[in-house]
Amino acid sequence: MKASEEEYRLNFFIKNDFKRKICKSCKTPFWTRDEKKEYCSDIPCTDYYFFDINIKSQPLTVKEAREKFLSFFEKRGHTRISPKPVLARWREDLYLTIASIVDFQPHVTSGLVPPPANPLVVSQPSIRLEDIDNVGITFGRHLTTFEMAAHHAFNYPDHYVYWKEETTAYATEFFTKELGIPEEELNFKESWWEGGGNAGPCLEVTVGGLELATLVFMQYKITDNGNYTPLKLKIVDTGYGVERIAWITQKTPSAFHAIYGNLVYKFFNKIGVAYIDETLLKVASRFAGKIDPDNPDTIKIHRQMVSKELGIDIKAVEEELDRAAKVFQILDHTKTIMLMLADGLVPSNSGEGYLGRLVIRRALKVLRLLKSDVRLYELVKEQIDFWKEDFPQVLKNKDYILDAVELEQQRFEKILEKVPSIASTLARKSEITTEDLIQVYDSNGIPPDLLEEELKKKSVKFELPRNFYALVAKRHQTSTIKSAYDKVKLPKDMLEYITALQPTEKLYYKDQYMRSFEGKVLGVYKNYLILDKTTFYPEGGGQLGDTGLIIDEKSSKRYEVIDTQKVNDVIVHILKEEPSTIKVGDNVRGEINWERRYRLMRHHTVTHVILAAAKKVLGEHVWQAGAEKTPEKGRLDITHHKTLTEEEVKLIENYANSVISDRRPVKPLEMNRMEAEMKYGVSIYEGGVPNSATIRLLEIKDWDIESCGGTHVSNTSEIGAVKIINVERIQDGVIRLEYVAGPALVDYIRETEAKIVEASKIIGSSPDQLTSRLRRILNEIEEKNNLIIQYRRIIETELLNNLKPYEINGNKIYIIEGLGDEEENKEILRKLTSTDNTIAISISDNRLQIATSKNMRVDKIVEELLKGGGKGGGKGTFANVILNSKKSKEEIIEIVRKSL
């Protein structure tokens, strides 16, 4: 959609002598007070000429630019709010915070909940990976991490705050009065914005080739068929570039110098790269507006312009700028890594962890291309020291950040050992596509740049996509949200049946200890029953649905409830049989299986206790990745970058039992969503993100608070005690803890005791002497194993000395019969085939093991053997074959002869 001219013809522009002009280059309309201006002052229509503009503001650091912006709007009636983490954990569809408006999506922007203040101002650290391949090349125009300073106003039908006129006036005042940019240099370029299903006209604020801000007026919803419908809630969504404000006031040769100051020189030094010639850098930066990274020709033209301007050989220019760009990339990436990990990201192969690992590996790849020996964590440590006052969480989580980065580098170095074999596999393809390279990266973590050198050795050429990492990131930056209907275990016809039914009153929230109740039947469909109220808890939040009885008050017939499910706010009781005596309007009595429910309540509550204990022991990066509570045990999946030690598991268990012994109150409370976020942070969403204006929280006094819709005990003492019974790494970056509490712990102890008694009987020992008896048995086994090894060596020596080969066409063929030990066979075959032109075959009934020397292959021998029927195979120099019938030594020799 393109907005009409009237959308942009503001009274503010008319009153302040702004003229609407059409850019001579891009043909886009823009507003300016300079009647002679012919260009929109945005790149690539102009070079970066802000270096030449007389700006009255003193040079501002990023910190000073941020504070100047926030203070300006605070003085003008805006409430300053704290930024959210760079991990968008209040969103189920997005992993990273890509803009300040994300702070308020989807619940504020949809009108579900009010904003935390109105109007408000925030400086939100953001991460976007769509431009990751362009970082450094454009001297700071593209970054993966940046601060979006923003003022927002939310205009409701009954509450107007401000709109286009005031927003444009604020921008003009800030840039001209606060920063001292000459009024004639300020331009407002007409544009259109779309994102997150919303749209609206916008104005891009440009000065001297630099876009400093975008003023979006969100006023349309984009429907599924692509139409635009007006929104009731009209939102002012602005974005000012804090780093660009610092750059334009400092006029440094690149944005990196303005952002990082002396850290730029420190990075060049630590990486071991000579600093770029200052004059070359200034000229290159001035012409950088001409670079369109998606068009490699523009990069070439830019370098030619620099070469011509300075009279320097083009190759020297390219080498200097390429080297500097790589250092700038590492500066940018290490800050992004720092912020991601500080906010709790754990590198992995999925979700947000995948994106974190992608940035880390790209930084490691660049260091490798620069042939630098510096460890990546050393550079991240420099970033922490530099930003610790701006972002206190980076210092708080410093140990975890550095440990995780070093571990990732070690893993990356191990992965690179696979490069030769992966390159060999790729070299066999007739054409290497971008999809092939992405597949190799996703499966093995190997960047294509590092495959390139290996493939060149094999004379294989391929085109490396310039935006490779952006392509990969795009595939992984969002998550699909399941609807309420996708999450339940109910048939489609049942889902359709309940759409017209009223919400069920949740008695289990009024009293979690209520065991029975009376309710009215609202719906009966097959073996599904819906009541007006219930104390049966439906499956959710990892807690199984309740079971129990429904009793027909007329006939006194009892129906067994085998499960309980929920769709939106309607609770469905699943019966073992169809309730033939019950119809709509009847009154029934419900009784939950209390012993089962109470076990679930204990396991659910202790899950919260253990999660907080894990954070205390392992660090704030720990995040719930999944959970399940059954009557028999609880399961909690947490994010963590390495396997837990026995000591860590013991500490988590000790903390949990200490909290149980402390008899801490456990209290559910309801709170406005925004109020809860502002008070407790987004960690309240560890168990999932509820879609409601008011959210239910569970507070364990002075220990944990989290959004949770489950059922819990009212005091930690009711849990009794907890024992962690299993710990395993279920996937990269995720650790699973399994535990038992209360009666389930007693069951576990009894089962363990029974196993000890049984084991004692088997080895002829009493339970209290089990350990010493086992030690004696193990010592005996070890002695016998050593004896077996000695006998094997004697047999092996005897066999090798006496075995005579068959000669076929200059090849030696050894046949071994009757050895039963597979590992012993392999070792003998390996020794027999240590010289060229040798084949060794071990025969045991109809089973064959075949080995060849390195200059031969087993393929053809296997193929010939299987002609007579059988199965098996192998590759290279070893194979296993099972024949349909046993063959003599002579028959085997003849088959081998044919294969040769």
From Swiss-Prot:
Zn(2+) binds at H604, H608, C708, H712. GO terms for biological process: alanyl-tRNA aminoacylation. It is found in: Cytoplasm. Keywords: Aminoacyl-tRNA synthetase, ATP-binding, Cytoplasm, Ligase, Metal-binding, Nucleotide-binding, Protein biosynthesis, RNA-binding, tRNA-binding, Zinc. It catalyses: tRNA(Ala) + L-alanine + ATP = L-alanyl-tRNA(Ala) + AMP + diphosphate. Binds 1 zinc ion per subunit. GO terms for cellular component: cytoplasm. One of its GO terms (molecular function) is zinc ion binding. Signal peptide: none annotated. It is an enzyme of class 6 (ligase). This is Alanine--tRNA ligase. It comes from Saccharolobus islandicus (strain M.16.27) (Sulfolobus islandicus).
